[in-house]
Amino acid sequence: MSVEEFDRLAEPDELSYELDEGELVVMTKPRPLHNRIVISLTFELQAFVKSNPVGEVFNSDNFYVLSPNTKRAPDVSFLRDERAKQIDPDVDIPGAPDLAVEVLLPNDTVSAMRRKIRQYFAAGAQIVWVVYPETREVEVWREPTRAEIILQEADLLEAPDLLPGFSLRIGTLFG
């Protein structure tokens, strides 16, 4: 299935979908813990960007067209200012976000998450953060083949190249 075919699909139900290399994927409905983490991180990033206008923060309502047959909607994403100013607000965002954040759901598989990470980087992402609610950890990816570091509750989440000055203690995400 192509991106164009995906866009023409009627949504007869309350399910959310992504397009994964031509395959329609039903997205699992998030649970409260997932939503709390997403809201917390979105709030922290938005507050930072409001005080430091370096780009724009998006939620999972926004699709990124990563290839002609792949559309993803990361839980949280960030585009640097120069890219954010160029997007057409009426269409999906071409390419990957500069920063993609995925919060793992209980039925997500490691292989499916690794596939998403590879897709983000192939389309131009600079950083991917993968949040693991059960272990209260965050993986920081700067390349598609391996996580650079795994952060735990007392560690600081930072992205100096994209968000100079942003710093968030990992434990803050988990309440």
Give the residues covered by each predicted segment.
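Gly/Pro/Ser/Thr-rich low-complexity, intrinsically disordered segments predominantly at protein N-termini
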Residues: 1-175
